[in-house]
Amino acid sequence: MKTASPSKKSLSRILPHLLLALIVSIAAIEPNLAHANGGLDKVNTSMQKVLDLLSGVSITIVTIAIIWSGYKMAFRHARFMDVVPVLGGALVVGAAAEIASYLLR
């Protein structure tokens, strides 16, 4: 009489689910593992630094784009439609930094 043994294919399908169940069980038993003993504070600090950097970069890019557009219109006699792509790009960069700031706070 043969006993049923799991094949390698069925074991490879079940293994990820078993590992996930094990991780969830350990996290439920030991909630301090989920908080990583202060690791969340480190992540928040790092993300705040990234947000500050993005804000500074976006302010710089928007300022340079406005100065460049003004110079081109004043001294090179460019039409407004000639500088719209640059101003639009600056608007997108500035908005992206602010949207990221809004989403991460």
Curated annotation (Swiss-Prot):
Keywords: Cell membrane, Membrane, Signal, Transmembrane, Transmembrane helix, Virulence. It comes from the Bacteria. One of its GO terms (cellular component) is plasma membrane. It comes from Brucella suis biovar 1 (strain 1330). Belongs to the PtlA family. This is Type IV secretion system protein virB2. It is a multi-pass membrane protein. Induction: Specifically induced within macrophages by phagosome acidification. Induced at 37 degrees Celsius in minimal medium, suggesting that nutritional stress is a regulating signal. The keyword Transmembrane helix applies. The chain crosses the membrane at residues 50-70, 83-103. The VirB system could be required for the establishment of the replication niche in the host. Coiled coil: none annotated. It is found in: Cell membrane. It holds the Pfam family TrbC. Residues 1-36 form the signal peptide. Transcription of the operon is maximal in early exponential phase.
